[in-house]
Curated annotation (Swiss-Prot):
This is Probable GTP-binding protein EngB. The gene is engB. GO terms for biological process: division septum assembly. Mg(2+) binds at residues 36, 57. Its cofactor is Mg(2+). The keyword Cell cycle applies. PANTHER family: ENGB-TYPE G DOMAIN-CONTAINING PROTEIN, MSS1/TRME-RELATED GTP-BINDING PROTEIN. GTP binds at residues 29-36, 55-59, 79-82, 146-149, 175-177. It comes from the Bacteria. Keywords: Cell cycle, Cell division, GTP-binding, Magnesium, Metal-binding, Nucleotide-binding, Septation.
């Protein structure tokens, strides 16, 4: 789906969050899981910076996303810092900047959390911890599996099944940042969660 994008700001503190407006879609995932590549793929432009250094981003980056012809943004995309890269095991929230918790817990316009997992590796404890926390605070989420191009067909099906079992979810949306697999499905989830009038085909 063609959209117009605009970088808003990078927030390193809760006081820097933009004023609540359009429905917000938060993108979360372990460091180096392909989060920025996913965001860039669905909007069709390189708005989210990719880094070869996992865990480098320590701000929430906000972007306006607008369909052509719309006077105001349809959504705000929030690119959150990656988690789970610390060498020493810690609690999930201890690895994130302190402002992440109030954003996920208190942000009034947060419509959907996109939890991004790597299908080419076994299910990770940190991903389950995140989903359990989102369940606890009542935030709607969808789990999206990236890096499907690294896994063969049969292995992909097995890995997706194992992810569903380990993460206690009914669906993991397989997604390719290099192709188009999963793009329509993810846009559909965003439209539904945000209450946006969807076109006949989202992508």
């Amino acid at each position: 789906m063609r959209v117009l994008t605009r970088f808003m700001l990078s927030a390193a503190d809760a006081r820097q969050f933009p004023a609540a407006g359009a429905p917000e879609i938060a993108f979360l995932g372990r460091s180096n899981v392909g989060k920025s590549s996913l965001i860039n793929a669905i909007v069709g432009s390189k708005i989210a910076k990719t880094s070869s250094t996992p865990g480098r981003t320590q701000t929430i980056n906000f972007f306006e996303i607008r369909r052509p012809g719309k006077p105001r943004p349809d959504w705000i995309f929030a690119d959150l810092p990656g988690y789970g890269y610390a060498r020493v095991p810690k609690e999930l929230t201890a690895e994130w900047p302190k402002f992440i918790d109030p954003y996920l817990h208190e942000r009034p316009t947060l419509a959907l959390c996109v939890s991004i997992v790597d299908v080419s590796v076994p299910p990770q404890k940190k991903d389950l911890e995140l989903l359990n926390w989102l369940r606890h605070v009542g935030r709607p989420f969808v789990v999206v599996g990236t890096k499907i191009d690294r896994v063969s067909g049969n292995q992909l099906r097995n890995n997706l099944l194992k992810l569903k079992e380990e993460l206690l979810v009914e669906e993991v949306v397989p997604f390719s940042a290099k192709g188009t697999t999963g793009h329509n499905e993810l846009w559909k989830k965003i439209f539904e969660a945000a209450g946006t009038d969807a076109p006949a085909t989202a992508g």
